[in-house]
Design a protein with these regions (language model features):
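Conserved mixed alpha/beta catalytic, RNA-binding, or beta-rich assembly cores of soluble enzyme
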Residues: 1-101, 105, 178
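General beta-strand structural signal in soluble alpha/beta enzymes
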Residues: 38, 118-121, 163-167, 177
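Long, charge-dense
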Residues: 97, 106-147
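Short, solvent-exposed coil/turn elements at secondary-structure transition points
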Residues: 123-125, 169, 181
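Internal helix-turn-beta structural module
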Residues: 132-172
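Short, amphipathic C-terminal "tail helix"
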Residues: 174-180
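Conserved small/polar residues in nucleotide/adenosyl-binding loops
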Residues: 183-185
């Protein structure tokens, strides 16, 4: 479970890290028991006493065959997030290899999620080959990188990131999820 932390609202005064909250003009009485929880997990649900903030910390790495089905790719991604208890609202971006810039399914997924798609050259993805949970000689021979989904997610998420969902695959696509540093919310 990757929950961040609980914060009592009345303790937020003069805390710069929570300036996003002040700008939202949320009115709460001084005696309120409203609690704020930072979480990327979908199982944490808001209620009248709990405000759930979903920091955008997840990068979805995607690899597909040419002409992959958008419906099947979307199902793979949504099922992966659901099965790992990850909130779609915590997704920051989609990452893939530059050879997929014109891949309809990936571009439609970016539109559906309303998230940017980050493209990397195979040489950039290969720089992190030792960190990968799964690498493939077949993928290397095909696109020039030992991995697309895992590598793209990790490269996009940055140096202090962690792969939290290894490559999950269907007949036409792969996806993996990396989490940006949990330290900086």
């Amino acid at each position: 479970n990757l929950n961040f932390r609980k914060v009592k609202l009345k303790k937020l005064k003069n805390v710069p890290a929570y300036s996003w909250l002040k700008s939202k003009k949320i009115r709460v009485s001084g005696s309120s028991n409203l609690e704020i929880k930072f979480s990327i997990n979908s199982s944490i649900k808001p209620n009248k006493e709990l405000l759930v903030y979903r920091p955008q910390k997840l990068i979805i790495g995607i690899g597909t065959v040419s002409g992959a089905s958008y419906v099947k790719l979307k199902k793979l991604v949504l099922d992966t997030l659901e099965n790992k208890d990850l909130s779609i609202h915590a997704v920051k971006a989609i990452a893939t290899i530059d050879l997929k810039k014109n891949e309809r399914a990936i571009n439609k997924l970016g539109q559906y999620l309303n998230k940017p798609i980050i493209h990397f050259k195979a040489s950039e993805l290969n720089k992190i080959s030792p960190q990968l949970a799964n690498s493939s000689e077949y993928v290397f021979r095909t696109v020039g990188s030992h991995s697309v989904a895992e590598a793209a997610a990790l490269v996009a998420a940055g140096k202090s990131s962690k792969l939290i969902v290894e490559k999950n695959k269907s007949a036409e696509a792969t996806c993996a999820v990396a989490c940006l540093s949990l330290i900086h919310i």
